[in-house]
Amino acid sequence: MKNDSVLSSTVYPSWHPRLPYVVFSSNKTGQVFHMLDTEKIEVLDWASDLVFYDVKRNVIRNILQTQSDFETFPCWSPDGKKVYYTCATVKELESLPDSLKIGFVKMNYRNLHYNVMSIDFDEKTQTFGTPVVEVDCASQNKSASVPRVSPDGRYLLFTLGDFGQFHIWHRSADLYIKDLKSGKVFPLTQANSKDTESFHCWSSNGRWIAFTSRRDDGSFTRLYLSYFDKEGKEHKAFIMPQQDPMQNVLLLKSYNVPEMTRDAVTYSAEDFKKVIYGKEEHAVKYEQNNNQ
């Protein structure tokens, strides 16, 4: 989804739980390859904003649009009254010409630290409130990505690493929880490993977490499951069972961005292809942010 008034194409969509609204981030993304590092590749944003899409009206607008704040990975709370996301602040970009900004981000990628944020949403007016820091990761020289709230609204699950936000490439990345009732933040020790944990999701009843991990060989992500009990405690993770167990050993591809469903998917890959590529494109209209 594109519009000249939006930074770039929209990614990381999250549907409102009841209304025909979608929040995205709009990201200018690039990658660099390491020559002398334990990591293989670094994926990073040169810029990113949050955008809101009204499906029925076919209207898109910016939620937050700043030069120095990189907002990404938005998700709605289960009641639809709040959006969670992550944000890194790079004040130096405010004084740099556009020609130097990408180079600055490349040279300082290890100093990009994303906090977990939230912002209130008023359904009646379609307006957003003031951003609030949920987890101050930057003060600990850490960086968060992919916040997701449990279906009961009690727990905020996110990935925490040393820097950046594309943690599927970071061995330091682990799963963390914030108890939104008590405010306590803690790692999922029974689910984490010495290697990468990154993208994740909740089951519809909030009792299971599915996530990607590179604990097996350090190169390919596999899907793991961890039971999350009513007391807010995770249990020992195990790899997703396959009809052929060797599938998890021999597959030279990575699983990515898991989503759990209550029912089997009834559409084929060809059905999705027709919807994505077979229909005529329609321009999306841009509307000024109501907050401005």
Features from the language model and the residues they span:
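Sequence signature of WD/YWTD-type beta-propeller architectures
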Residues: 1-292
